[in-house]
Amino acid sequence: MAEIRPFHGVHFNKALVEDLAAVICPPYDIITPEMQKELYRRSDYNFVRLEFGLETAHDMDTDNRYTRASKMLRQWLEQDILLRDDKPAVYLHDQHFTHKWKKCRRRGITVLVRLEEWSKMVVRPHEGTLTKPRSDRLNLLWALQANTSPILALFEDRKIAPLLETQAKGEPMLEAKSVKGESHRVWAITEPEAINRIQNSLSHQPIYIADGHHRYE
């Protein structure tokens, strides 16, 4: 059912951006105005500048948060602040955090997913969407020609759990700890056999969007 593919990920260059904790940001829809300003102060390369840039009183069609983000993305790529991986990969992501005084781990994979109409029930929603946030994310997508944040989806398949566990024993390509104490580790899975196993595990089932309905639409 769900068709997934590896892709060439873009990420911060650790040789030029040593403190990854200073450049990561939360999802756009939970960033308050105060948090936005703090993230700007934290680093000239904080990702909020692309994901949810500041608006100004002088914004216009040719100079606004979307055009500024587009210009900045091009600059970061030209300056090697951001690097594009040579090989397509499935990216394994482990997040460790504390919730209600309990230590938790969230494990996921970041992949490309073929867009499907809701009526096909391949990708399934659980909530409606609003025009304003949908328009905001679409404007950013058009300006950058890139996705700045993933759509969080759920699926159940215990068959690939051992494969992901094996991959997680290797050295992560990226590792960071947020100011709130959450730790993140990312591995790039590039072996064709491993990628095929992951693709096959999802080929017979739907996936359920947990967060990101506006961006999917």
Q: What spans do the regions from the language model cover?
A:
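A cross-family signal for N-terminal binding/gating loops and helix N-caps
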Residues: 1-217
